[in-house]
């Protein structure tokens, strides 16, 4: 009877939302795993590397490798232990919020706190911890050697903050990052091991309250040709760090304040404001493609002009027909360029209808979170033809919806990999999910 109901549900869903896709779920063996943002990449060895996060005071997030050829998952390590903080009773290294960046046979990434204090509906760096525990020691920069399968701790982020955003100049071996909650912009030279702190990027960042709050940029766009690094603030300013400079500069001739993106209060903690949500470098065109999270608009950023060109809206077809934005308050991070260097992949939302009415969700939230239930859609965009395609909603074989999806990697098998919530036997965990794209 249950199987009949599942088949009926999928039939109705496909009729309402389009053809749709069925996702395969994995079990990495981490039942307490919580939501991951970014935290997944495909490496040159053809394997998928990912982090499953944790919000516990007692253990950290965990690193895994999915081996495509063997179709098996290998556990690589606990973030807290990798950072040398096992049994120290400090707030654990619960998360990694960044992609893996490959350089000379190593994957570079960083850590973030997962245990917070909730204040006025917002996640705050924990200053109040249980008796016997200590405060968060700070995020670490880490390297994983693909040949020896060993980790290296490169040290702490500036001001003992967590690392929220990180990218890499792979031509010169320089990491760029933004910390949390204040938001210090920093660089780390892999060869010389020199860390430089260039100061806060947006006032008090996410440590502020009320009018002093500023949501931080989640994507640092690095131009490998010049070595320049770009990021935004919620006011819509674009900042540039030029290789060798002593400070960051604001671009005078371009910004993200576009009418198509909407109107935002930069002190609003429930949106990304005018920040870009995710960016990716296109090696052939030597430009960035990016998505503005709250509007879902695709744009092209040529740093040499500089110029932002708004292209098309990448939200799902049901969202466009409804005229509504995604229900994830920051918009989605799952945006990347495929191996063919012409196809953009985007995991976005789509409205859910009940009795013919759209489930609206909450009007306002105070942090990055889902305001209500929505479907997951896979959208592809052919850069050469400006060809948009919504592949329809994604469901698990049992009819459930993947939720809290803010990561993406396209494997050497041309399948899409992400991290999403999975419910099994009444328990919810975040785990690896595979989506086969219908061509």
Which residues fall in each region the model found?
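Loop/turn-rich, solvent-exposed surfaces of beta-rich toroidal or solenoidal domains
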Residues: 290-291, 324-383
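Beta-strand-rich domains and repeat architectures in extracellular enzymes and scaffolds
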Residues: 27-61
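Surface-exposed loop and turn segments in beta-propeller and other repeat-based domains
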Residues: 26-29, 76-92, 152-161, 198-212, ...
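Repeated scaffold domains used in trafficking and secretory/extracellular systems
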Residues: 34-39, 84-99, 161-167, 206-221, ...
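Residue-level detector of Asp-centered blade-edge/turn motifs that repeat once per structural unit
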Residues: 42-45, 102-104, 169-172, 223-226, ...
């Amino acid at each position: 009877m249950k199987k009949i109901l599942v088949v009926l549900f999928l039939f109705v869903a496909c009729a309402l939302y389009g053809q749709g896709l069925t996702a395969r779920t994995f079990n990495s063996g981490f039942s307490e795993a919580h939501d991951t943002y970014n935290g997944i990449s495909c490496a040159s060895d053809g394997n998928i590397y990912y982090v499953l996060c944790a919000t516990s005071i007692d253990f950290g997030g965990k690193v895994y490798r999915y081996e495509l050829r063997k179709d098996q998952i290998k556990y690589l390590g606990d973030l807290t232990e990798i950072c040398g903080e096992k049994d120290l009773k400090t707030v654990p290294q619960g998360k990694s919020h960044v992609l893996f960046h490959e350089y000379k046979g190593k994957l570079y990434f960083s850590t973030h706190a997962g245990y917070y204090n909730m204040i006025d509906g917002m996640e705050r760096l924990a200053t109040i911890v249980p008796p016997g525990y200590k405060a968060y020691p700070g995020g670490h920069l880490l390297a994983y050697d693909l040949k020896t399968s060993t980790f290296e701790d490169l040290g702490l982020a500036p001001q003992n903050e967590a690392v929220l955003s990180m990218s890499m100049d792979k031509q010169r071996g320089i990491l760029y990052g933004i910390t949390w909650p204040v938001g210090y912009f920093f660089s780390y030279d892999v060869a010389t091991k020199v860390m430089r702190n260039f100061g806060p990027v947006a006032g008090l960042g996410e440590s502020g309250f009320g009018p002093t709050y500023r949501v931080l940029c989640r994507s640092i766009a690095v131009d490998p040709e010049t070595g320049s690094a770009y990021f935004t603030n919620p006011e819509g300013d674009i900042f540039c760090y030029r290789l060798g400079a002593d400070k960051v500069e604001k671009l005078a001739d371009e910004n993200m304040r576009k009418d198509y993106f909407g109107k935002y209060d930069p002190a609003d903690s429930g949106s990304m404001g005018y920040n870009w949500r995710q960016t990716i470098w296109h090696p052939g065109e030597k430009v960035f493609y990016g998505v503005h999270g709250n509007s879902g608009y695709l744009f092209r950023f040529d740093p040499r002009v500089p110029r932002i060109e708004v292209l098309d809206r990448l939200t799902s077809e049901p969202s466009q027909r409804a005229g509504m934005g995604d229900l994830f308050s920051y918009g989605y991070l799952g945006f990347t360029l495929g191996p063919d260097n012409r196809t953009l992949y985007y995991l976005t939302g789509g409205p859910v209808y009940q009795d013919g009415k759209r489930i609206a969700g909450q009007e306002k939230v105070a942090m990055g979170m889902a305001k209500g239930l929505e479907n997951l859609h896979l959208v592809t965009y052919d850069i050469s033809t400006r060809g948009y395609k919504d592949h329809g909603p994604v469901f698990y074989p049992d009819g459930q919806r993947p939720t809290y999806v803010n990561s993406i990697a396209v494997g050497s098998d041309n399948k899409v990999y992400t991290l999403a919530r999975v419910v099994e036997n009444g328990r919810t965990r975040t785990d690896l999910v595979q989506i086969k794209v219908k061509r």
